[in-house]
UniProtKB/Swiss-Prot annotation:
InterPro entries attached to this UniProt entry: Ig-like_dom, Ig-like_dom_sf, Ig-like_fold, Ig_C1-set, Ig_sub, Ig_V-set, TCR_beta_variable
Region (C region): 145-321
One matching Pfam family: C1-set
PROSITE patterns referenced in this protein's UniProt entry, alphabetically: IG_LIKE (PS50835)
A GO biological process held by the record: cell surface receptor signaling pathway
Record key words, sorted: Glycoprotein, Immunoglobulin domain, Receptor, Signal
Annotated stretches, region: D segment: 123-128
Signal sequence bounds: 1-28
Annotated source species: Feline leukemia virus
Protein name: Viral T-cell receptor beta chain-like T17T-22
SMART domains (alphabetical): IG (SM00409), IGc1 (SM00407)
Region (V segment): 29-122
Length: 321
């Protein structure tokens, strides 16, 4: 929740205040929703963003925040009527409908349109005493020259080092996602089928694999730290999942390669027993023990049947005699 004066006339003071507030805090869980959250488009295409304000709120705002810059007001509505505009290109259009939701349309997209688009709402019209704005999570748009550059990540999980385990009695698994573009990814760790957050440390944001304007692929790393005892249990399953936000199913794709759609890419590993067993050897041992048990059980059953048959034959002979 952020409090500031949203009046268009406030100029640089508004920009400074919003930039400090937004860059210093994450989106508020306010009940305002935006769709879609991620978009990847080619230059010249068009997109539509939707915003659903909090019920009863009369003021609605659209902002554009480019990388490394503060948010810029695009357009403001009060009670579904336009009340002001900022730097609003002619290629852009917006509307607020009778049900209060709003759409921001962008046509003939340019590379410079790549930004985070934020929608906010407030219960009242702005005043000189300030007004509290409630923001959504934003819609992130990346415009590329060539959709062929879009690529999902390759994910690898590296097991803990024995040196660390011996020294600290802790085990750190490392997940590395490489070769993806754009940098629209969300990384999570899963242990035994459940997402975990304790002990997880992930890079603040993806970074370019190599410096230079011609390099476009990104990488991201994350670490999961558990106790040595937990790691040495071969039944524990560790999985690193990277959700890549790529093209939509309806986006045109004219290349022979697989279409880089939004997808989950994962890598996993199993815990390793302290006595040197791997997960595979542990499972093989369990399987062998199960088979041996079934063989012994089968032999016991056959022996019981044989004894029963012999006893029955002896009983029949006694009757005959």
């Amino acid at each position: 929740m952020i409090s500031w004066l949203p009046s268009v006339a406030m100029g640089s003071r508004l920009l400074c205040c919003v930039a400090l507030c937004l860059l210093g805090a994450g989106p508020a869980d306010s009940g305002l929703t935006q769709t879609p959250r991620h978009l990847v488009k080619a230059r010249g295409q068009q997109v539509t963003l939707s915003c659903f304000p909090i019920s009863g709120h009369l003021s609605l705002y659209w902002y554009q925040q480019a990388v490394g810059q503060g948010p810029q007001l695009l357009i403001q509505y009060y009670n579904r009527e336009e009340r002001g505009k900022g730097n609003f290109p002619e290629r852009f259009s917006a509307q607020q409908f009778p049900d209060s939701h709003s759409e921001l349309n962008m046509t003939s997209l340019e590379l410079t349109d790549s930004a985070l688009y934020l929608c906010a709402s407030s219960p009242n019209e702005d005043s000189e005493y300030g007004e509290t704005l409630y923001f959504g999570e934003g819609s992130r748009l990346t415009v590329v020259e060539d959709l062929k550059k879009v690529s999902p990540p390759k994910v690898t999980v590296f097991e803990p080092s024995e040196a660390e385990i011996s020294r600290t009695l802790k085990a750190t698994l490392v997940c590395l996602a490489t070769g993806f573009y754009p940098d629209h990814v969300e990384l999570s760790w899963w242990v035994n089928g459940k997402e975990v957050r304790d002990g997880v440390s992930t890079d603040p944001e993806p970074y370019k694999e190599q410096s230079g304007a011609n390099v476009s692929s990104y990488c991201l790393s994350s670490r999961l730290r558990v106790s040595a005892t937990f790691w040495h249990n071969p039944r524990n399953h560790f999985r690193c999942q990277v959700q890549f936000h790529g093209l939509g199913k309806d986006d045109q794709w004219d290349y022979p390669e697989a279409k880089p759609v939004t997808q989950n890419v994962s890598a996993d590993t199993w815990g390793r027993a302290d006595c040197g067993f791997t997960s595979a050897s542990y499972q093989q041992g369990v399987l062998s023990a199960t088979i041996l048990y079934e063989i012994l059980l089968g032999k016991a059953t056959l022996y019981a049947i044989l004894v029963s048959v012999l006893a029955l034959m002896a009983k029949v002979k006694r009757k005959d005699s």
